[in-house]
Amino acid sequence: DKFIGNAYRLEYGISMDKLHRGSNFGRIILETPYETLSYEVVVEKDICRDEEHRANEKEFNGILKDYLKYEGDKMSLEDWTEASIKKISHLREGDERNEFYLLAQAHICILGNRMDEAKWLLESYNYNRFAIGKDVELSSYYLYLTTKLSNDSIGQRRVAEELSRSFMKHPDSWRILCMLIEVDSEYKIYSERLNVLEKQFMEYKSHSLWFYLQAFRCFKEKSSSLKKLGQFEVQVLLFGVKYKLMTKELALYTANLASQMKNFDKHLYNVLVKCYEMYDEAMILTSI
C-alpha cells in the first residue's frame, strides 16, 4: 500500500522436497489493477554439467590408467593405492550420493590389500537384492566385490549364478561380463574367457580399458592362448603395446604368428613396430 516507485524486491520460497532432479520450471504472476506481470523461474536440482561430467570422467580414467602403469611395473601398488584413494575421495566429495564411487573406492582398497577399509565401505552400501533390476550393473558390482573379501566357495558360486542371470538379461553389459569371468569357474579356462570376450567385442564394440585388460591378461599370462590375429586379438594387442604391457615372450609369439599372415594388416604392423621399440629382436624385425 505504501509502495511508490518503479522497482520492488519480491521474496519467495521454494519447497525443495517438491523438486525433481534436473531443471524445474515455474512462473510467478503478479496482478495489479493496471497490468499482469509474469516472470519465469528455473530451479535446478542435482544438475551435473557437461564440463563437470567430463572432469569427473577424466579423473576416474586417471585411476584406471595409473593402474595400467602398475600392471606394467611402472608404478608400485602402494603408490597407486594412495593416489587412487585421494582421487576417488575427491570424486565422492563432489557427488556424495554417487554409490558407484563408493563401490569403486572399496575396489581400490581390495586391489591395494586394504581389506578392512574395503569391508567397512561395502557394509555402508545399501544393497537390496530385491531392487537389483533398478541398477543391475551397480548391484552386480557390489556382489562381485563381496567375493573378493571372502573365501566362501558356496557364496562365490551363488554370486556367479546371480551375475550369470544378470548378464543373460543384459548381454550388452561389458561390465557385468568382466565381473562374471573373474567369479565364474567356467571362465578360468583362457579359451572360454577369450571366446566370450571376443563375442562381446564383435557384437557390442566394447572398448573400455578394463575390458581390454581382461583380454590382454589372458595373452600375457599364457602366450599360447593367442591362437589367431583377427580384429579382436589385434585390438587387444594394440592396447597392450600402447600401455607398454607387452612382455618379451608375447611380443615374440605375436611376431611368429604375424610372419604366417598372407595379407598386410596396418594395425598388426603398428603392434609389431611398437613391440620392436620395446624389444630389439631379430624375429620381430623380420616379421615387420
State the predicted function of each range.
Residues 1-11, 124-129, 138-144:
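Surface-exposed binding patches on compact interaction domains or structured appendages
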Residues 10-14, 21-34:
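A short beta-strand micro-motif common to beta-rich folds, especially ectodomain repeats
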Residues 40-71:
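Low-complexity, Pro/Ser/Thr- and charge-rich linker/hinge segments at domain boundaries
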Residues 57-63, 79-91, 115-128, 152-167, ...:
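Alpha-helical repeat scaffolds
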Residues 68, 75-79:
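Long, compositionally biased charged/polar accessory segments in the mid-to-C-terminal portions
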Residues 80-81, 91-98, 105, 131-136, ...:
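Residues that mark the junctions of alpha-helical repeat units in TPR/alpha-solenoid scaffolds
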Residues 102, 139-140, 177, 212, ...:
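TPR repeat positional signature
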Residues 107-111, 142-149, 180-183, 217-218:
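Residue-level signature for tetratricopeptide repeat
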